[in-house]
């Protein structure tokens, strides 16, 4: 399938970018949501040094996309990257791997960076919502014999569902519109394995000078972003 994209199949490249966009969005959204929820629940407990942990977790969010992309590109480097050095020493691989130059691993290496940067954003929303729940509610539930799992499903989740939904939509907009990380790390390669609709539109417009195709892809992206933005605005207005 990938090889056929190299022989000029515009439809194949376009379809692959759409498929990658869907996979990129779903994996990012699910992993970031679950990880953010777990971290927020942990930081909502009375932990020693909680403020330090909170600050450290927020660091990825504060790092600019360009800095994060360059840093991880260096870490993934086949010759001097720390990931290869550690993996070889631990016996996980026998020789250095070009992680970003390999069709099978490039997509997952880039998505790992996006997940690393995206988790803190959603965690802030969830943690803020959790801190608004009175401890008395949980104490009453525990007296009635409710387990922690039951408290989460019957108390926590219903109370934070609105801010959780809003943060998820905002995160979704950021995930779908992500361009910098992919372009700086792989430019959609190798062999279009990390190509998403945004990089596809950029390539067609500014490299291939095919402005018609780029404009069509941009219109589709605009429609999706408008829908997500509309959902977000509706949620905010209903909450108010």
Label for each model-derived stretch:
Residues 4, 9-10, 14-240:
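A structural signal for multi-pass alpha-helical bundles of membrane permease subunits
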């Amino acid at each position: 399938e990938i090889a056929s994209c190299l022989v000029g199949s515009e439809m194949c490249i376009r379809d692959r970018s759409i498929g990658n966009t869907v996979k990129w969005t779903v994996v990012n959204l699910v992993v970031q949501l679950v990880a953010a929820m777990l971290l927020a629940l942990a930081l909502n407990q009375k932990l020693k040094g909680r403020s330090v942990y909170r600050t450290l977790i927020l660091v990825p969010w504060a790092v600019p996309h360009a800095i994060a992309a360059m840093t991880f590109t260096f870490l993934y480097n086949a010759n001097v990257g720390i990931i290869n050095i550690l993996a070889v020493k631990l016996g996980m691989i026998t020789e250095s791997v070009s992680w970003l130059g390999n069709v099978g691993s490039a997509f997952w290496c880039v998505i790992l960076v996006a997940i690393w940067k995206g988790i803190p954003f959603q965690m802030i929303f969830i943690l803020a919502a959790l801190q608004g729940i009175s401890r008395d509610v949980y104490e009453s539930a525990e007296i009635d014999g409710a387990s922690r799992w039951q408290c989460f499903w019957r108390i926590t989740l219903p109370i934070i569902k609105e801010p959780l939904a809003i943060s998820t939509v905002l995160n979704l907009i950021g995930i779908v519109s992500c361009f910098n990380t992919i372009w700086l790390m792989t430019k959609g390669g190798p062999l279009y394995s990390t190509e998403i609709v945004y990089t596809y539109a950029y390539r067609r417009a500014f490299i291939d000078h095919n402005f018609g195709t780029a404009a069509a892809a941009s219109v589709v992206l605009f429609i999706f972003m408008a829908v997500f933005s509309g959902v977000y605005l509706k949620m905010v207005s209903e909450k108010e």
